[in-house]
């Protein structure tokens, strides 16, 4: 575990499933920010707060969320298939398709957020933003209630370490076990 500057404790890559779950919490917080932007913008426009919020959402989904999907698609999902987890193939197919849809939605939403970040626009497409938030929330709920418990059940110590090492390497940080 690593302590943050503000005292928050984040799991280390020696506990990669906890890292993924913590990331789900951060994605949820970014979705909360998007939801707040939907109500903030019509009243306040692209003021400094809106620009800062857009910047934070952009930074998160352009970096950490990309790593997160790579962690799952390149490492976790193949490990679940490799150990022969029940239903893993169907699960992986469904979740990968959802990741693809989220990526498409993000590309469209990203353009709008960039305009808000620059103060050049003061609206978000409510349907697009709502779909992005809704799909993220249902996707994360499913992963938290089905995928992560399955992984905790079927992955052994060696697979967990392999996952953690890959996740740390993706971020260019040392793996400490």
Predicted regions and their residues:
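Small-residue-biased structural context
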Residues: 1-177
């Amino acid at each position: 575990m690593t302590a943050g500057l503000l005292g928050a404790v984040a799991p280390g890559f020696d506990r990669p499933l906890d890292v993924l779950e913590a990331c789900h919490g951060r994605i949820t917080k970014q979705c909360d920010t998007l939801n707040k932007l939907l109500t903030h913008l019509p009243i306040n426009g692209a003021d400094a707060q809106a620009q800062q919020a857009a910047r934070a959402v952009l930074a998160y989904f352009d970096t950490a969320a990309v790593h997160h999907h790579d962690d799952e698609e390149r490492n976790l999902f193949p490990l679940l298939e490799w150990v022969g987890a029940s239903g893993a193939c169907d699960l992986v197919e469904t979740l990968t398709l959802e990741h693809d849809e989220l990526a498409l939605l993000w590309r469209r939403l990203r353009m709008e957020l960039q305009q808000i970040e620059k103060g050049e626009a003061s609206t978000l497409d409510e349907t697009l933003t709502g779909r992005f938030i809704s799909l993220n929330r249902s996707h994360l709920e499913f992963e938290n209630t089905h995928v992560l418990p399955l992984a905790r059940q079927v992955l052994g110590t060696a697979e967990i370490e392999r996952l953690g090492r890959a996740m740390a390497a993706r971020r260019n940080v040392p793996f400490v076990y």
